[in-house]
Amino acid sequence: MRTFIKLILKILMFFISWIVLAILIPIPEGISDVWWRFTAELVPFLAIVILTYVFNRFEKDRLSIIHFEEPIKQTLTGMLLGLIWFYIPFLLLNSLGYFEITDRSQIHMLGIWVISAFINSIMQELLVRGYLYQLVKRKYNIWPASIVSTLLFTLMHGGAFEAGPIAVINVITMSILMTIILECSNSLVIPIIMHFIWNSLGGIIFGTVSLADDYPHLYNIEITGNPIISGGSFKMEGSIFVFIINIIMIGIAYYPVSY
């Protein structure tokens, strides 16, 4: 019981410290939208990096957080899995007429927007499956760690609750998938790359994934038809197709972990 209380206090201290740092570090005023978003993503990212380093320094045995064993292989694997993960439901919805590309927009400084999405992906994975995940896993095992990470990930995507049960289930299964990929690879690199591809392609290129409201998207897409299939207002992340793909990929990824 004492170990459990100590663990809960450490989790709360870490999470609250991250929120406080992210709020207290000011974002400059009077800058363009692209640089405002870049700074808004950079601040919580720096906060999580600093806290991860500081808290891990106080552990008797350092926790392995990212683990760059085969960075090139892991990056290429993450890119391949991320493309499969995104394009299968996207192409299905597009070919069946639920998504239709209507026109194309011009995005000023597209590269900075993409870098901002990358920073956001690293920040989320470090927060959800970094220090806290490894801490709970060491104290107990993978199952409590997975529950904690999934709860955090779901809370960070609270807009899903407004979109309906499928959107919530998709967020949960996405988190479970990323956790299994983490355990398969013993590294955060692949989940980070997959998360980034999902957000950059879905949020910035096609606009079928919900990011912060100020993120632009290159293509304008009209979403029509049954919201259970199309995703409705929550876009692709509210689609039953994404749930199916998540479950299939979870099953494939879980097999080597369980045996």
How should each PLM-predicted stretch be described?
Residues 1-15, 35-46, 59-91, 105-110, ...:
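Interfacial transmembrane-helix boundary/kink motif in multi-pass membrane proteins
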Residues 1-62, 203-259:
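N-terminal, membrane-interfacial amphipathic/helix-forming hydrophobic leader that caps
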Residues 15-23, 86-91, 150-158, 197-205, ...:
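Aromatic-anchored segments of alpha-helical transmembrane domains
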Residues 17-32, 52-63, 89-96, 114-117, ...:
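Hydrophobic alpha-helical transmembrane segments
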Residues 36-41, 144-179:
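Alpha-helical transmembrane segments and their immediate interhelical/interface regions
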Residues 39-50, 110-115, 123, 127, ...:
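Membrane-embedded alpha-helical segments of multi-pass membrane proteins
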Residues 103-163:
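Function-critical hydrophobic alpha-helical transmembrane segments in multi-pass membrane proteins
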Residues 167-227:
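Functionally important transmembrane alpha-helices
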